[in-house]
Amino acid sequence: MSEQDLPLPIGHFVTLDSGLRLHYLDEGSGPVVVWLHGSGPGASGYSNFKGNYPDFIAAGFRNLVIDLPGFGRSDKPDNINYDLDFFVSAVSGLLKALDVQRCTLLGNSLGGAIAIGLGLAEPQLIEKLILMAPGGVEERATYFAKIGIQRMVELFNAGPLDIDKMREIMSLQLFDASHLPDSLLAERVAVARHQPHCLFSTMMVPNMTERLEELRVPILGFWGTNDNFNPVGGVMKVLDNAPDARFIVLNRCGHWVQVEHRELFNRSCLEFLLQA
């Protein structure tokens, strides 16, 4: 299957000054919410958030659902380092190209780390942050000690992922694997076949805990106590260091709060966004 034929909606494309071409969905009108997905094989903005952003459209928000470089319909260069600075620069470039002056960043896992990184780099751009089990608050070795990360990297490096292998990876993301329809697995398998091997081997995200005090914007966070990818102890890293943060911690919940507790997630986010 060619990238043109991926089972994902086609939205808009922007080419950055670097030549990198990024894909994004632009849905709704109003204050801007930027959706930043995580780093799982085959991920895209749509596959991560298709159960969430429609409620934000209905509530009067403009939603920029981005495919990060290396994912979805965006470019997937095989000759670069997929480190945090690269991702932050790419998202910043896209927002500048779209003349976004102010926005809320909403990020899951790697996307949460990017949201923190961009919030530190360009604080004037950020109105609020919504973080779901964000990366960037532990050392790399801590994340790679988690069974979810270990198995994900092992299966990705072993060769092309099929539906069964993708189901194994994605089941580790959730407490209740019944939330995994075959259509979602098929979307991710199709994207994963185009992803370069350097994507995960060069993915370096620093521990930003000591800089969280610089984030002077309201933060709403979510974390599942059964997270197999990012340790739930990260909650206290954010609460102890960021000046204005609150978290919803859920038991019987894995790495994908927005999927396993969709209604609670959508409602809580919208209440947070609509607060003065």
Show which residues each predicted segment covers.
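Short beta-strand/loop motif that positions the catalytic acidic residue
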Residues: 215, 221-223
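Conserved HGGG/HGGXW glycine-rich cap/lid loop of the alpha/beta-hydrolase fold
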Residues: 16, 20-73
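Active-site loop/oxyanion-hole signature of alpha/beta-hydrolase fold enzymes
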Residues: 25, 58, 65-106, 267-270
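Acidic catalytic loop of the alpha/beta-hydrolase fold
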Residues: 225-230
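Catalytic active-site module of serine/aspartate enzymes centered on a nucleophile-bearing elbow/loop
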Residues: 245-276
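Gly/Ala-rich beta-loop-alpha elbow adjacent to hydrolase catalytic centers
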Residues: 107, 111, 115
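Conserved alpha/beta-hydrolase catalytic His-Asp/Glu region
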Residues: 145, 159-216
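Flexible "cap/lid" loop of the alpha/beta hydrolase fold
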Residues: 116, 120, 127-160
